[in-house]
Amino acid sequence: MPSIIFGCLRKIPEGISLASDFYRVESNQVQFLRDMTFMQDSTRIVDQQIYPKVYDLIDSAEQFLVLDIFLFIETSIDTNPEWIPTTTLLTNKLVQKKKNNPDMPIYFITDEFNIFYYSHKNKHLEQMKEAGIEVIMTNMAKLRDSHQPYSLFWRLIPRWFGNPNYQGWLPNPFTEPKEDIAIRSYLKLLNFKANHRKIILSEKEAIITSANPHSASSLHSNIGFRMEGEILQDILFSEKAIAKLSGSSIDIEFSPQPTTGPIKIQYITEQKIQKSLLSNIEQLDASDSLDIGVFYISDRKIVKALKKARERQAGIRILLDANKDAFGKEKNGIPNRQVAWELHKAGIPIRWANTHGEQFHTKMDIFTEPDSVVIIGGSANFTKRNLGNKNLEANIAIKAPRRESISQEVKQYFHSLWQHEKYSLPFEAYKETSTLKYWLYRYQEFTGASTF
């Protein structure tokens, strides 16, 4: 029992679970980005802004680049000819940048899932290494355990067998073409925690997003934010912390110039995201509103806070993924349909993203007060794993007057998704009232025995 408690409550390394100061920026120094996929007259429409802006960021960088990316696997496009080879495109862009600028430091931080916990190599990561880009695999063992008590077993026995050194003999269900997996890798996977961040940083600007450069995710709907100013130093500090806990280092120093302006922005990670969300939800009253668009919602603190805010007559609307698709495989609707039923009974309007094989992968809140708007968005789903110092996550919080263009853009984005059937469907479309599934969700959320 003490080992389980220690694994769940272990000290967080310095630089993890960070909330920066709020920095003032001008209207043109923070920008909302979105990827939208929808059907129109039986034709799939894919309208994307995020990775085109990422490529622009890479092109304009002059001093350094730091990327922290969760999913970075190029599943064969033959699996679905509509998929975009984003992994290859980003790899080529970075390799060319290094070739043209051999003295520029480029760091690429990623999760061990992309080499399936050392069962096989990732050809795109190998290409970057050969080009002189430093690839850092995140050591998640130093963070709190997500799947208890399984992680106690893993720490006691399988962990000490080490990594499989790119050898395996079990089938891999996640990639095409198939590559064999070691049993030690499967055992490590079952800890269910990851470096889930999606950050692209240069000395000029940063992009924080919910979008992975991963072919099987390339049609998902996502959001992102481009930002400039002093916040870049906090992002770099946090990325240095991940490199350090992974046995590496990022040897970059720079000091962005202070900026002024009507908009305030803050960098928040891990459990500080939950703290920011709860603080804003708990301040809602009848004169305020909250619009949420999110891929997963299951965290009990968030759910309870939303129900209490509705009791205070706050206007709340929640747009969810129906949790029915994952890379061509059918899902069972947990946890969103169970939480949606609970929130629906509390009087909160719910709609479902109208997806067709892709996912509504957005993670964003829009708090509207009489004179201002607070926007929180990035990589973090609203789950215990994402908000409880178990995964690594990165979000931005933005406070802006209602008249500002970014306030208007995010509100119009959500309004369009909510109002039009090509984007969203009524609650009844995926209504789920199974008591058994509800308590299965509660068990999985409590123990971490799930992928959400």
Question: What is the role of each PLM region?
Answer:
Residues M1-F452:
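Charged, low-complexity intrinsically disordered terminal segments
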